[in-house]
Amino acid sequence: MKDLVLYMTIGYPDENTFFRMLDMLDEEKVPVLELGIPVGNPFVDGDLIRQSHKKVLDSGIGQKKIIRWLQRIRRDYKFCIILMTYKEGMERFCLSELDKNLYDGILCVDEVIRADTGMRPVQIYNETMTEVQMLSLLAENKNFAYVMSGNGKTGSFSCLPDGYKRTVHFLKKNTNLPVYVGFGIKTLKDVNAVCSHGA
């Protein structure tokens, strides 16, 4: 499972259940965990993730709780930790102020985080980008390149789009970073499809 990245909203549905699920992921040796930092308007996410964000926000999450959870995750688990959020989450929880040893990288959906911040950013690519735009993002990219399988919200695709194929092909030619495909990957058939096209 060295190329598997799983997403979970931090603290969802509650602290105890969240950490029990992390125990299971650790036992299965999941290599990379994308931790969603909740926001009020996760506009590229589908209903399930939107609901999870709302539940965690309603529970009263703040920066101190995020730090405490990240410290526990760092102490108890082996997987790589990628924080995934929006500009709203960056600002609301002052994520740029976090100890950078608490996580391995950060992905911000609607703002480019520069590599010189030391936050080891993961950049997002999609089929609408030009080659110049993708090369510009690669210069700011650490950890891995994240390719959206298509345009739309997570969970909104009735079948896997194929617009990602050109993007994956271009990135593989221009970087040694791993290239992962996300959004709309729901079945074993989907997994096999993206793997067969270089992801």
Predicted regions and their residues:
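Ordered, amphipathic secondary-structure segments that act as subunit-interaction surfaces
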Residues: 77-95
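Hydrophobic, well-structured mid-protein blocks that either form specific transmembrane helices
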Residues: 91-127
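Catalytic cores of alpha/beta
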Residues: 15-27, 95-96, 129-140, 174-175, ...
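Hydrophobic faces of well-ordered beta-strands that scaffold small-molecule active sites
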Residues: 4-8, 33-35, 79-85, 106-108, ...
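Alpha-helix-loop-beta-strand connector modules within alpha/beta enzyme cores
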Residues: 46-82, 117-127, 160-181, 185
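Glycine/Thr-rich beta-alpha phosphate-binding loop at enzyme active sites
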Residues: 49, 133-170
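Glycine-rich phosphate-binding active-site loops on the catalytic face of alpha/beta enzymes
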Residues: 31-42, 102-115, 146-155, 184, ...
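Conserved N-terminal beta1-alpha1 strand-loop-helix module at the mouth
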Residues: 1-77, 139-142
